[in-house]
Design a protein with these regions (language model features):
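Active-site helical microenvironments for divalent-metal-assisted chemistry
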Residues: 1-151
Length: 151
């Protein structure tokens, strides 16, 4: 299987998982996923695939289905991609700064994808302002602190 075919498979899996999901501003969530993937595409295949899959585990409900997604990612893309996707997947009840970002920072692929994810979130936060100014301000502070934390 070629690298392009693997990238296409990753995008297909992300589309299946995210389905009709929308972001907080009401835009199709896959727009965010593909924007993050595009922003890291020059870093290489692994970064692009992880970007496409970066929210698949976290956004899969119910929990039982997460095991299937994890298995599909490991079987399809191997341990390097799997480890990065797991590292970038926030766990329920996990502290964002004390636990999650520390784990992300330990995986070079997850780190670069998360930085791109945060930057994309900051760029697109304007869509929230008309819907929920308070939430947009909270997220802006959170993302800026996360960028500082990750370096």
């Amino acid at each position: 299987m070629t690298i392009q075919e693997k990238i296409e498979r990753a995008e297909r899996l992300a589309r299946i998982v995210h389905g009709d999901q929308v972001d907080k501003a009401g835009r199709p969530y896959m727009n965010h996923v593909t924007d993050v993937a595009y922003s890291v595409h020059k870093l290489g295949y692994a970064f692009r695939v992880v970007a496409l899959l970066h929210d698949t585990i976290e956004d899969t409900k119910p929990k039982k289905s997460r095991k299937k997604i994890r298995k599909a990612i490991r079987d399809e893309f191997g341990d390097v991609i799997y480890d990065a996707v797991v590292a970038i997947s926030k766990r329920p009840d996990e502290d964002y700064f004390k636990d999650y970002l520390v784990r992300v920072a330990d995986n070079p692929i997850a780190l670069q994808v998360k930085l791109a994810d945060i930057k994309m979130n900051l760029q697109n936060i304007w869509g929230l302002i008309e819907n929920d100014h308070k939430e947009a301000s909270r997220l802006r502070r959170k993302y800026k602190l996360a960028l500082t934390t990750l370096g």
